[in-house]
From Swiss-Prot:
Subcellular location: Cell membrane
GO molecular function list: glycerol-3-phosphate O-acyltransferase activity
Species annotation: Mycobacterium tuberculosis (strain ATCC 25618 / H37Rv)
Protein name in the entry: Putative acyltransferase plsB1
Keyword terms, alphabetized: Acyltransferase, Cell membrane, Membrane, Transferase
Domain commentary: The HXXXXD motif is essential for acyltransferase activity and may constitute the binding site for the phosphate moiety of the glycerol-3-phosphate.
Main location per the UniProt record: membrane
Length: 621
């Protein structure tokens, strides 16, 4: 047995496995309060007995197994351990100054006095799980227990972390029904005890910088508890954590090129701790509008059309609120400008892209991290210097003026930072492409609102696994608003001449489609091209993705794609997910599979051509 396994299951579990100690089915003096309460609860024992009958197993065997899982996952809050952990957390966070909105904290304190708070946070760093609990305590909110992956429960840190509120849960539990039962019961007991909670709604760290689709497990267990227990409201608190820069990003981007992820262990922790000795700016902690879970469930169930999908809809709502709470960092807009150009720029050229973008962000009433002035030359220069110091950006200053560009093999790192703000820009980018497509395809010289809408909905469908879009009705409303922001459009509900649509795009203060969507469409183009060329009856996903990486490198060298960031395993996997959703991967025996794969490739090639047209229009401005 490895040190990692000992750290995860504990010495007592090890002694049980070798037969020295039996698992106690009654409370122990060392058990956390929730473990004692559950082992003494009649309802818990009755449901365990029913589960044993369902599984055809001996009840005592199931009870012992359940008690072991319960002790494995249950956390406590030992005052001395917590104080020591807080000191360790602050030391590990020393690369950053943490900024928290005081007004948001004041509102949370009011809710904290009367309700349970469940913080669903965006997850970009291992540091998130330390930053949020520390901020909760530092700002005089009730302590929170944090759900985390069992991969972080390694020796010797796991046992300490459990005494500071860390709940380590296994990821793969499909074949462990007793474990799933125990986790559900434990979550219910926590809600019953009005314990504040935190967890990553994404289920793991994003590898791209933008929010991943929500994982429903913890939210489902909390919802089940709310359904069963009469008590105070549980507020889901959308929580955004974003950083100026992160030491971890470079390691994540190597995984995007196909490298194997390193395991979390003591060596990992030492490496992470050493990295934090280099200052990287600020970390920004922001909270979206809290969602009253019990009330929201009642509202949804009152509408019969909403029953059966409550968890999914609430999770998406929470993620939308996280996005809305996420501020734009100067690092994100500088990365956007440099990646879009894919060449070195003077500071004046960077500002030429950033200033109209800043005006657009202001028009959307979106917060800028630290209230930074994105139009200020000093702000942009300082950001460039910080990115040079971390190696993401290179500078050449031996000529007549300094020019900055993305460093060698740093495109995915810069893309990660850009993507922290990309959710703000996606609807605008889609609107630009939809207008262009409608103007291109008109047969009578007129562009109807319905055509623009349909083109936008087609793009939304193409990118639905990549970005978090609003529901259709809200999306159409947002689309109309984006068209109004592009230029002098009086009424988006009336047809317009195609020539006027072209002029609208040509005269726009800023065009974003090429800056926002081109990297993703280029990656999709690689996947679609390779899929159209695929002739084998069987489909080897690992081999296919490896081929995409190789062809992606070729296309990068040939300039068939605009940037190296499109050569990403993460983007390829999402494109393949879309293809599988369209039944273009499996079922290769279908008679029309080759035709439909080619149509898919043509669809993406057309979208890519149009985004390059937008890039050309932007270049002429």
């Amino acid at each position: 047995m490895t040190a990692r396994e000992v750290g995860r299951i504990g010495l007592r579990k090890l002694l049980q496995r070798i037969g020295i100690v039996a698992e106690s089915m009654t409370p122990l003096a060392t058990d956390p309060v929730e473990v004692t309460q559950l082992l003494d609860a009649r309802w818990y024992d009755e449901r365990l007995r029913a589960l044993a009958d369902e599984l055809g197993r001996d009840p005592d065997s199931v009870r012992a197994e359940a008690a072991g899982y319960l002790r494995e996952m249950a956390a406590s809050l030992d005052e001395r351990a917590v104080q020591a952990w807080r000191g360790f957390s602050r030391w590990l966070m020393r690369a950053y100054d943490v900024l928290v909105d005081e007004d948001q904290i004041t509102q949370l304190r009011k809710l904290d006095r009367k309700a349970t708070l469940a913080f669903a946070f965006s997850h970009r760093s291992y540091l998130d799980g330390m930053l949020l609990p520390e901020a909760i305590l530092a700002n005089r909110l009730s302590p929170a227990l944090t759900f985390g992956g069992a991969n972080l429960n390694f020796f010797p840190m796991g046992a300490w972390a459990k005494r500071t509120g860390a709940i380590f849960i296994r990821r793969q539990t499909k074949d462990i029904p007793v474990y799933r039962f125990v986790l559900r019961a434990y979550a219910a007991q926590l809600v019953q005890n009005h314990v504040n909670l935190t967890w990553s709604i994404e289920g793991g760290r994003t590898r791209t910088g933008k929010l991943r689709p929500p994982v429903f497990g913890i939210l489902r267990y909390i919802t089940d508890a709310v359904d069963e227990i009469d008590g105070p409201e549980v507020y889901l608190v959308p929580t955004s954590i974003v950083y100026d820069q992160l030491h971890e990003v470079e390691a994540m981007t190597t995984e995007a090129y196909g490298a194997v992820k390193r395991p979390e262990d003591l060596r990992f922790l030492v490496r992470l701790a050493r990295q934090q000795g280099e200052r990287l700016g600020r970390a920004y902690l922001d909270f979206g509008e809290p969602l009253p879970l019990r009330k929201r469930l009642q509202e949804m169930r009152a509408d019969k059309s909403g029953t059966g999908s409550e968890i999914e809809r609430i999770a998406l709502d929470v993620e939308h609120r996280i996005n809305r709470a996420t501020p734009v960092t100067p690092t994100a807009v500088v990365s956007l400008a440099l990646l879009g150009a894919d060449r070195s720029l003077s500071i004046s050229e960077v500002l030429a892209t950033v200033r109209p973008l800043a005006s657009y962000i202001a028009a959307r009433n979106w917060a800028v991290a630290g209230a930074a002035d994105l139009t200020n030359r000093s702000t942009i220069r300082w950001t460039l210097h910080q990115m040079v110091a971390s190696g993401v950006v290179s500078v050449y200053d031996a000529g007549t003026e300094a020019v900055w560009g993305i460093g060698e093999d740093q495109h995915l790192v810069a893309a990660f930072y850009r993507n922290t703000a990309i959710h703000i820009l996606v609807d605008r980018a889609v609107a630009e492409l939809a207008l262009l497509a409608a103007a291109e395809t008109t047969t009578n010289g007129s562009v109807s609102p319905a055509t623009v809408r349909d083109e936008a909905l087609s793009l939304r469908d193409l990118l639905k696994f990549e970005f978090l879009f609003s529901g259709r009705a809200q999306f159409e409303k947002d689309l109309a608003n984006e068209v109004l922001l592009i230029g002098s459009v009086v009424d988006t509900s009336k047809p317009a001449a195609a020539a006027d649509v072209w002029r609208l795009l040509e005269s726009a203060d800023v065009l974003l489609a090429h800056l926002v969507l081109r990297p993703f469409l280029d990656a999709y183009h690689i996947v679609a091209d390779r899929l159209a060329a695929h002739e084998d009856d069987s489909f080897d996903e690992e081999g296919f993705l490896a081929e995409c990486l190789q062809v992606g490198k070729q296309w990068e060298l040939q300039r068939n794609i605009a940037s190296a960031e499109s050569r990403s395993m993460e983007l390829f996997k999402t494109a393949l997910r879309l293809a599988r959703h369209r039944e273009l991967v499996d079922g290769a025996d279908a008679t029309d599979i080759a035709k439909r794969r080619q149509q898919f490739a043509d669809e993406i090639a057309t979208a890519t051509r149009r985004v390059n047209t937008i890039a050309e229009l932007a270049r002429r401005q």
